[in-house]
């Protein structure tokens, strides 16, 4: 399955929330696409609810099925609560960290910046969006890329104290992962236990 490149508003309406950020269309049409107005919804099966939650997580973080499954299997064998570890692994992806640091306005934009070699890890260019950032590593912007409009606009006025597990040096345009985020540090509205139940069948 290829990465979804269609209208983000359609996906946001599917889940009934702005999983890609603020969505003006969602405020007007807060019901799934294909449904005419707020008519009575059919009751979704237990499997359907679990599958929906997995899809929401995949769309939110821009991860394909094979990548998502691999992350789940890694989380399942790690210490800790499987669902929380899964979210921590998703949060630790380089594209997500670039987004959380405010270097890019969206995760999709962050993926592009990483893929196009605008981002460094510990001073070395890394162009793999799924690269797993470790505590203590420094995430920066290449010197020649610091003037890019998308980066400058995204960083302008960004609140870098939003996430306690990250810090940012405005002068050098370098961020640091202080520690792995706790579940309370992750603002995404994802019921990770449903994903664990789905994969445990």
From Swiss-Prot:
GO terms for cellular component: small ribosomal subunit. InterPro entries: Ribosomal_uS4 (IPR022801), Ribosomal_uS4_bac-type (IPR005709), Ribosomal_uS4_CS (IPR018079), Ribosomal_uS4_N (IPR001912), S4_RNA-bd (IPR002942), S4_RNA-bd_sf (IPR036986). Keywords: Ribonucleoprotein, Ribosomal protein, RNA-binding, rRNA-binding. Gene3D superfamilies: Ribosomal Protein S4 Delta 41, Chain A, domain 1, RNA-binding S4 domain. GO terms for biological process: ribosomal small subunit biogenesis; translation. One of the primary rRNA binding proteins, it binds directly to 16S rRNA where it nucleates assembly of the body of the 30S subunit. Belongs to the universal ribosomal protein uS4 family. Part of the 30S ribosomal subunit. Contacts protein S5. The interaction surface between S4 and S5 is involved in control of translational fidelity. This is Small ribosomal subunit protein uS4. It comes from Bacteroides thetaiotaomicron (strain ATCC 29148 / DSM 2079 / JCM 5827 / CCUG 10774 / NCTC 10582 / VPI-5482 / E50). The gene is rpsD.
